[in-house]
């Protein structure tokens, strides 16, 4: 296993425990995360904390695993599968994905996700979801 994959596995292990600060510790200060093609990227650690909070409010991620990976220099490609439950509908879904990571000095600087956006939508902000249910 390459060094880049070890960093990503540490990030995944932190998230599986819902250790937000452990997750954040694997990211560079200037992290740029493209999660959904219709949304602006999350840039910086504070935006990542906000993203993780919104993601957890929107989805119960029950599984997140790597199926294949390949490294080329500072770039890591990961093919995987996650099992999610949409908290707003209760619908459980298997979500195959590809993630591309760029790393510098042992930290993730860029993350891009590719998946079926017709199945997984961007979660509502927690305050917006509460306002709709009121």
What kind of region is each of these model predictions?
Residues 1-26, 107, 125-134:
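Short, low-complexity N-terminal intrinsically disordered segments enriched in polar/charged residues
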Residues 21-74:
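A solvent-exposed, acidic/Ser-Thr-rich amphipathic alpha-helical stretch
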Residues 61-64, 79, 93-99:
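Short, surface-exposed coil-to-beta transition loops
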Residues 73-82:
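A short hydrophobic beta-strand element
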Residues 82-84, 103:
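Hydrophobic beta-strand positions in extracellular immunoglobulin-like domains
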Residues 84-92:
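Short, cysteine-centered beta-strand-loop-beta hairpins and adjacent loop/turn segments enriched
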Residues 100-122:
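Short beta-strand edge/turn micro-motifs at domain boundaries
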């Amino acid at each position: 296993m390459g060094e880049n994959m070890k960093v990503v596995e540490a990030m995944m292990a932190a998230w599986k425990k819902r250790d937000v600060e452990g997750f954040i510790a694997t990211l560079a200060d200037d992290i740029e995360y493209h999660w959904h093609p219709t949304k602006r990227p999350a840039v910086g650690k504070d935006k990542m904390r906000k993203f993780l909070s919104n993601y957890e409010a929107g989805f119960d991620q029950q599984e997140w695993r790597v199926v294949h990976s390949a490294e080329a220099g500072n770039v890591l490609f990961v093919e995987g599968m996650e099992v999610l439950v949409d908290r707003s509908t209760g619908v459980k879904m298997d979500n195959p994905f590809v993630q591309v990571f760029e790393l510098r000095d042992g930290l993730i600087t860029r993350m891009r996700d590719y998946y079926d956006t017709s199945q997984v939508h961007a979660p509502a902000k927690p305050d917006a979801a509460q306002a709709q249910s009121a």
